Swiss-Prot record:
The lineage of its organism: Eukaryota, Viridiplantae, Streptophyta, Embryophyta, Bryophyta. The keyword Magnesium does not apply. Belongs to the PsbN family. May play a role in photosystem I and II biogenesis. It is found in: Plastid, Chloroplast thylakoid membrane. It comes from Lopidium concinnum. Keywords: Chloroplast, Membrane, Plastid, Thylakoid, Transmembrane, Transmembrane helix. One of its GO terms (biological process) is photosynthesis. It is a single-pass membrane protein. This is Protein PsbN. InterPro entries: PSII_PsbN.
Length: 43
């Protein structure tokens, strides 16, 4: 394969992996540990 194709595949896989990890952190098990600053400062 050409170098440009390999680089494009690598970048695409990296972006998909990062997006999946971000969604897992936001909505998966670790989301229970996230704090909500709006609930901490009720007026």
């Amino acid at each position: 394969m050409e170098t440009a194709t390999l680089i494009a595949i690598f970048i695409s896989c990296s972006l998909v992996s990062f997006t999946g990890y971000a969604l897992y952190t936001a909505f998966g098990q670790p989301s229970k540990e996230l704090r909500d600053p709006f609930e901490e400062h009720e007026d």
